[in-house]
Each structure stands twice: as structure tokens, then as C-alpha cells.
């Protein structure tokens, strides 16, 4: 049933949600009617209604992500949201980052003038973080919950243990490749700040995102939540983008999001096992307890072109080709990917795959 909501899936194998999530028929119709109101009633009525709707929208966001509405903030995208949030932190704080992490995350700290150090991305990244924290003092750890190139999923249980060992450590997560793809309850997580865009796994279209702050983070700012909200909503906001995210989240609620991500997780686990068995993925992917539904397959431009010719949507990332599975994907999509990869390998036996 879910697949029928997305017209592109009738003629395309779409394995590119990690790049851009699909738009449903329902969201497209909502956006048309939303802008029709603007056209027929004028910008003044359109803007006043948007501000009237803000509280209810944030209540929906808070309910979905597991926190109170006064500590979540709609924003135009991850990049804008993280920079606004970082403006509340003292610049003297030392930050630990990961090399090859999402550039807009690492650049945000550089732009704000924070003292930072980086560790190399590696398959057992949690061990590397632990060793670095032992050797140097850091006030902030910032990382993507899912690494956008490889699909590595950070172990949140490890982050809980880290919090216990370093209770004053502020943990910041880029959730763009995580939110909407995995179950998440912010107030039961180890994070003090999570920000993400809504156009990928949340399927909210362009022009929206979310920022979530822990009670400890808010207390550390010595600001009232009203003052924090004013900074996030300084000037006008993306009215259509915010309304679209609200609509998308209500749709996820209505379609039983928890069941959808369970189905996605099962398909992703099957994809991981098959891709490893066929030696299309490096061994470290199978050695970790958990992985996301994003996979990076070696093959470069030749493989990318071959997949495109076979009507499989994907994207080049790093030295490989990245594919990703969402809940609107099916086992049929996985079988087509595997069949196409095997055909490519037969035709290009000289190329390495892992």
C-alpha cells in the first residue's frame, strides 16, 4: 500500500533516499492546496495562519521525536538549525569531530571559531573516540548518527556509557540520515542536541528541518526557552516547508511509523547479508552489531553508469556507489539490485568490489 503513494516507484527502482526522499501523492496535493490558499487569500492571511499553526506543528514534532514542544524547533534545514543552536555554546569549548563526517556539521564549528580536533573515520569508531577522550579533554562530541558516505550507524548504547563516564560531555548528533529511518525518542537518547533536515528519510520535501535540545543543554545556555525560540524564528520562516514537514510527520503517525521502520529494518538486514555474502561490501559492515540501511559499494563511475542504465537510482559517494533502502522499497528492489550487480561483475571481473 505504501509503495502506491509514490508514483515514481511504478517505473523506477529508487535506492536513493539518502540523497533525497520521494514525494508522495498526498504531500504533493497538500502543497498544492497550501499554496492555493496563498493565491486566493493573499500573503497576509497566509502568514497569519502559518504563525497560528506553529504551536500545533511543534506539538506534532515533539510527540513524534519524544520530547516537549518547548525544546524542539522547526527550521529551514540542518545547516541553518545547527548553526543557530551552536550560537548558544561558549566558543572556548573544545570539540571532537570525525574526519570525513558531513561537511556542513564540521564546517559549522569552524565557522563559529571553536577549538576542535578530528579523528579518522574507521570501522570501530567508538573505540577511537574512547581513546581520544582518554588522551585529551573535550567538552563537546559532535558526529553524524549515521555516516552519510558509508552508512555506519553510531552505537547509542556506547554513547550512554560515554555519558556516564563523562557526565559533562555535550553530545551533538546530525540526524539527517537517521531521523525517519529509525525509531527515536530524544529524551531517552544520549544526545544533548540533534538536528536534521526533513527532505530525506522524513519525506517532508525541501525547506524544512528540526532541532532538538535536551533539558541540560537549555539549562547550560542560561536562557529561557522563549528566548531560544526567538533566535530560531528571527525573521520569517519557510511556511510551505514547515507545513510540509508537519504533514509528513502526521502521515508517518497515521501509517504506523513503528511498523514501517521494522519492515525497513528487516529488508535492510537482508540486503546487508546478501551484499556481504556476494562480496559487494567490506567485511567490517558485517562485523558491527548494527548498520543503517545505507550501503556503499565499490565500483566507481563504471558501476554507477551501469546501475543508471538499468534504471536503478543511486549516487556516487566517496570511492563507491551509495544505495539506500526505505520502507517504500521491497524485496523486488533488492533482488533487482543484486541481479544487476552480479551482471556487472561478470562483465567487469577485473574490478575490485570490497
Regions found by a protein language model. Name each.
Residues 45-46, 229-272:
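Structural signature of PLP-dependent enzymes
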Residues 265, 269, 278-310, 317, ...:
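Conserved PLP-binding catalytic core of the aspartate aminotransferase-like
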Residues 124-176:
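Active-site phosphate-binding strand-loop segment of PLP-dependent enzymes
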Residues 1-4, 306-354:
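PLP-dependent enzyme catalytic core of the Aspartate aminotransferase-like
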Residues 50-93, 103-105:
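Conserved beta-loop-alpha segment that forms the PLP phosphate-binding cup at the N-terminus of a helix
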Amino acid at each position: 500500500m505504501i509503495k502506491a503513494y509514490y508514483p515514481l516507484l511504478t517505473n523506477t527502482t529508487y535506492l536513493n533516499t539518502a540523497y533525497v526522499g520521494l514525494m508522495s501523492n498526498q504531500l504533493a496535493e497538500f502543497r498544492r492546496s497550501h499554496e492555493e490558499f496563498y493565491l486566493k487569500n493573499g500573503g497576509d492571511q497566509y502568514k497569519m495562519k502559518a504563525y497560528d499553526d506553529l504551536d500545533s506543528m511543534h506539538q506534532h514534532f515533539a510527540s513524534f521525536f519524544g520530547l516537549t514542544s518547548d525544546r524542539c524547533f522547526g527550521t529551514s534545514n540542518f545547516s541553518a538549525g545547527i548553526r543557530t543552536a551552536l550560537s548558544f555554546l561558549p566558543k572556548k569549548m573544545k570539540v571532537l569531530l570525525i574526519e570525513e563526517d558531513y561537511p556542513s556539521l564540521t564546517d559549522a564549528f569552524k565557522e563559529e571559531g571553536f577549538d576542535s580536533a578530528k579523528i579518522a573515520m574507521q570501522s570501530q569508531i567508538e573505540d577511537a573516540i574512547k581513546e581520544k577522550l582518554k588522551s585529551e579533554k573535550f567538552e563537546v562530541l559532535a558526529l553524524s548518527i549515521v555516516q552519510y558516505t558509508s552508512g555506519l550507524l553510531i552505537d547509542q548504547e556506547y554513547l550512554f556509557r560515554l555519558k556516564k563516564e563523562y557526565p559533562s560531555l555535550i553530545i551533538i548528533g546530525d540526524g539527517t540520515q537517521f531521523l525517519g529511518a529509525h525509531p527515536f525518542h530524544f529524551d531517552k537518547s544520549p544526545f544533548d542536541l540533534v538536528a536534521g533536515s526533513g527532505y530525506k528519510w522524513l519525506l517532508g520535501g525541501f525547506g524544512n528541518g528540526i532541532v532538538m535540545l535536551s533539558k541540560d543543554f537549555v539549562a547550560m545556555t542560561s536562557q529561557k526557552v522563549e528566548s531560544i525560540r526567538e533566535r530560531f524564528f528571527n525573521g520569517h520562516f519557510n511556511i510551505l516547508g514547515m507545513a510540509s514537514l508537519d504533514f509528513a510527520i502526521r502521515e508517518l503517525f497515521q501509517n504506523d511509523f513503528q511498523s514501517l521502520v521494522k519492515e525497513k529494518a528487516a529488508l535492510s538486514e537482508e540486503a546487508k547479508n546478501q551484499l556481504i555474502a556476494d562480496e559487494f561490501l567490506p567485511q567490517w559492515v558485517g562485523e558491527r552489531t548494527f548498520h543503517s540501511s545505507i550501503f556503499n559499494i565499490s565500483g566507481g563511475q563504471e558501476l554507477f553508469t551501469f546501475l543508471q542504465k538499468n534504471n536503478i537510482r543511486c549516487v556516487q559517494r566517496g570511492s563507491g556507489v551509495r544505495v539506500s533502502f526505505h520502507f517504500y522499497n521491497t524485496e523486488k528492489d533488492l533482488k533487482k539490485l543484486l541481479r544487476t550487480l552480479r551482471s556487472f561483475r561478470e562483465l567487469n571481473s577485473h574490478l575490485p568490489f570490497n
